[in-house]
């Protein structure tokens, strides 16, 4: 709401206004050069100013030519009004779907036909077994060894935590163990057995 100004021979004034309770405010003098808060322009950094001042079209292109170029660049099979209401990412996704429709079915059919060709049927007709391992399902002994090493490391860490907890209880640093801490202490034997078994296997 803009403030009503009254001009007099002595300068500008904000007119006297009535408060909700019925009393009147005095007219107030406005200093020269004062700009009310509502009329102060909002701060814009240099990037905002740059993009506001940037033209929509490339230099030298007329608006008529730009409209023709936009019509020619439309995606086939999609109405113009549908494209106009979409965001950049939605438009990009639509283009990807179009590409997948053009390329996708052939590659899926090839994969399925290869899988069917490699299948062999047992004599009784009940069991179906693949002739060879499918891609990605090969057994890798190095990954199994790495997995065992990871398990051993985890168990050793848990045992170390149990030992530290036991030392704190013995020294009196922890006066009484909580339910979770007691469960942790109870699992120590099981963890040691599991560690021995893993070390024997490896």
Curated annotation (Swiss-Prot):
S-S bridge residues: none
Main localization (coarse): cytoplasm
Record GO terms (molecular function): ribosome binding; RNA binding
Coiled-coil ranges per UniProt: 142-200
Matching Pfam families: Mago-bind
Alphabetic keyword roster: Coiled coil, Cytoplasm, Nonsense-mediated mRNA decay, Nucleus, Translation regulation
Cell compartment(s), UniProt: Cytoplasm; Nucleus, Nucleolus; Nucleus, Nucleoplasm
Biological processes per GO annotation: exon-exon junction complex disassembly; nuclear-transcribed mRNA catabolic process, nonsense-mediated decay; positive regulation of translation
Biased composition (Basic residues): 89-102
Region (Disordered): 54-73, 86-143
Entry keyword Protein biosynthesis: no
Superkingdom of the organism of origin: Eukaryota
GO CC field: cytoplasm; exon-exon junction complex; nucleolus; nucleoplasm
Family, as annotated: Belongs to the pym family.
Assembly and interaction partners: Interacts (via N-terminus) with magoh and rbm8a; the interaction is direct. Associates (eIF2A-like region) with the 40S ribosomal subunit and the 48S preinitiation complex.
Function: Key regulator of the exon junction complex (EJC), a multiprotein complex that associates immediately upstream of the exon-exon junction on mRNAs and serves as a positional landmark for the intron exon structure of genes and directs post-transcriptional processes in the cytoplasm such as mRNA export, nonsense-mediated mRNA decay (NMD) or translation. Acts as an EJC disassembly factor, allowing translation-dependent EJC removal and recycling by disrupting mature EJC from spliced mRNAs.
Descriptive protein name: Partner of Y14 and mago A
Species the sequence originates in: Salmo salar
Source taxonomy: Eukaryota, Metazoa, Chordata, Craniata, Vertebrata
